[in-house]
Amino acid sequence: MWQSVFTFLQKIGKALMLPVSVLPVAGILLGIGSAHFGLIPDLASDIMAQSGGAIFGSLAIIFAIGVALGLTHNDGVSALAAVVGYVVLLATLGVMAKALGVESKNLMGILSIDTGVFGGIVIGGIAAALFNRYYRIELPSYLGFFAGKRFVPIITAFAAIGTGIVLSFLWPPIGAGIKAF
């Protein structure tokens, strides 16, 4: 049993390497841009700083894509499913935040509960699991267009709704605990 747990965690670790590999360039851009060196024009510094900040601000979706790709042998459909799932997750969390009276934040133009990178990793894992299970699914002929890989983003969207509802109850106390540190 421990061997299978270790193997699973090893797969997750490998999947996280792709999004982690983006962090150095984000740090370099942000650092050089924010330093406003005299040799670099102010406009170029501002562009670099904003570019690095944009990467750091998008880490959740970057991790969603990276985890999905890492757990599906780099199949692009899983990346699309992760993006669809992440956006649906944000929308669901936003609706639930309003219903529960929980603080929300503008993320990618959507008012939502901010789960940070955790939400991206979760939805990336869900997208990958659904891809690995359903990428060969056969549907009745009248739904044939949606069979196979085309089914994966659809089922991921519905899974993201359920995940968002569950996270809307679980994340606020967890997030508050993290903020307390």
Model regions: which residues?
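Conserved, well-structured beta-alpha core segment at the onset of a catalytic domain
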Residues: S58, A160, S168
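Small-residue-rich segments of transmembrane alpha-helices in multi-pass membrane proteins
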Residues: K149-A159
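Early transmembrane hairpin of solute transport permeases
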Residues: V5-A147
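Aromatic-rich transmembrane-lumenal/periplasmic boundary elements in polytopic membrane proteins
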Residues: G164, W171-F181
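Alpha-helical transmembrane segments of multi-pass integral membrane proteins
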Residues: L23, A157-G164
